[in-house]
Amino acid sequence: MAIINMSDLDLQGKRVLIREDLNVPVSNGVVTSDARLRASLPTIELALAKGAAVMVMSHLGRPTEGEYNSEFSMQPVVDYLAKALSCTVRLATDYLDGVEVAVGEVVVFENVRFNKGEKKNDEALSKKMAALCDVYVMDAFGTAHRAEASTNGVGLHAPIACAGPLLAQELEALGKALDNPARPLVAIVGGSKVSTKLTVLESLSGIVDQLVVGGGIANTFIAAAGHNVGKSLYEADLIDEAKRLVANAQSRGGDIPVPTDVVVAGEFSPTAAATLKAVNEVGDSDMIFDIGPDSAEALAKIIESAGTIVWNGPVGVFEFDQFGEGTKRIAQAIADSKAFSIAGGGDTLAAVDKYDIADKVSYISTGGGAFLEFLEGKELPAVAMLKQRGA
């Protein structure tokens, strides 16, 4: 089932409603990080260039649903877009019963979460949104894993529902990495807990050639290998699960390597003194915060030989420089690799920024939860809806 792409449609004179992910941090009425806004501009500009009357909607923050709260207003986003686009951009507060929009202008709807029923994918609300447009464009990969009125329901009732360029690009990159990857396929999964990434680890251990774990997740695997992890964050109840994942990977000719050396400290703080130890020398009062240089080099070699790299999560507490060398080495190896690489997840993107490798990663995913659910092998509700409407 093919998904209809916005770029293939004739939009001349059409009312086009675009769902973007414009959920950006705002301080004192000013947008403080504009990455998502910049990512959405090409889609809005393309719709304008195609002669459409453009309406844009998004959520912003977590207001109480159904209640207006000026703290979560889209006004700062409107102010930003008004400067970035060479056309009229205005905010519409009461839009569900109809809104005037002319060809060549952009109307931004007030925060969709001010509407009661948004999160529950309310059918009456979805139909009201759908009645506003000739074409609905889903372009918000970051919210594609949520079945809500503005991301799912509206698309089921709109005359035409299609994928915007940003969403299409995202799905193409993820498909390239997971559906038909150049081998060896290497996945790096970091983060603090195995429990939050268990389904990702299970899904990936069945398709990747090499699975690398880092951060707090690695501590559980270190414990599963029989080593002391001291006072480190780990999940004792998931040790058997970790052993099963290792056995699963090895049965396919892969592995989940455990670090041979680690960086430890006695406390979690920006000023904690870092000590390098062999993995079998970790003491009862030690906390593991990073992989050591030997382990980092071993992982860099795995990355160098990869055909495809999927990166989700740092391998240490890189926010503190003394525990950032492992993640820095991984980032450098990915940057130096000629493999197709995709990075996603908030902490990962922070590491990409910190080590300045954004232009060296083949594709940077805008989705956090959606990226994870895609890695888990789940079909995202927004994608299922677009396939249904494209059939």
UniProtKB/Swiss-Prot annotation:
Pfam families: PGK
Keyword Cytoplasm tagged: yes
The EC number(s) this enzyme carries: 2.7.2.3
Residues at which ATP binds: K197, E319, G345, G346, D347, T348
Residues binding substrate, per UniProt: D21, L22, N23, R36, H59, L60, G61, R62, R113, R146
GO molecular function: ADP binding; ATP binding; phosphoglycerate kinase activity
Catalysed reactions listed for this entry: (2R)-3-phosphoglycerate + ATP = (2R)-3-phospho-glyceroyl phosphate + ADP
Quaternary structure (record): Monomer.
Protein family: Belongs to the phosphoglycerate kinase family.
Annotated protein name in UniProt: Phosphoglycerate kinase
Originating organism: Shewanella sp. (strain MR-7)
Gene behind the chain: pgk
